[in-house]
Amino acid sequence: MDATLPFLILYACLSVLLFLWDAKHGLLPDRFTCPLLWSGLLFSQVCNPDCLADALWGAIIGYGTFAVIYWGYRILRHKEGLGYGDVKFLAALGAWHTWTFLPRLVFLAASFACGAVVVGLLMRGKESLKNPLPFGPFLAAAGFVVGWDSLLAGR
């Protein structure tokens, strides 16, 4: 039996769980992001060992990129602009999709978020800008779009 399918089911379940949890609570708990990260690295080791280094670099670059944004904004504005769960979620997505897909993933997530802001403005006006916008659902959606290329097409 091919080991890919159980890994992809785990990826889908954890990503949907993170999508729903962040949309409802505004949090991305470690108990969901950490298993997603480790399962992504294990997936590469078991199913595609040639890409393990790329998956590891994906986790490092994903974490590092969003950590710089998180801390830079926090230092400059004295408040959070991006949750640290988003930092860990991008690290996990980097482990699954490798570093080569991270630019596309972040661009898609940001595009989805901008679209949601525009829809919110059109439907509720400026009131919609007063509430923080969870970024996790957009990362999860972008992960599924990018996953079509990176995971199902064999990287």
Curated annotation (Swiss-Prot):
Pfam families tied to this protein:
Peptidase_A24
Q: Which family does it belong to?
A: Belongs to the peptidase A24 family.
Which GO molecular-function terms appear in the entry? aspartic-type endopeptidase activity
- Gene Ontology BP annotations: signal peptide processing
Write down the InterPro entries for this protein, in alphabetical order.
Peptidase_A24A_bac, Prepilin_IV_endopep_pep, Prepilin_peptidase/N-MTase
Species of provenance:
Escherichia coli
Report what the protein is called.
Answer: Leader peptidase HopD
What is the top-level taxon of the source organism?
Bacteria
A single GO cellular-component term from the record reads: plasma membrane
Organism taxonomic ancestry: Bacteria, Pseudomonadati, Pseudomonadota, Gammaproteobacteria, Enterobacterales
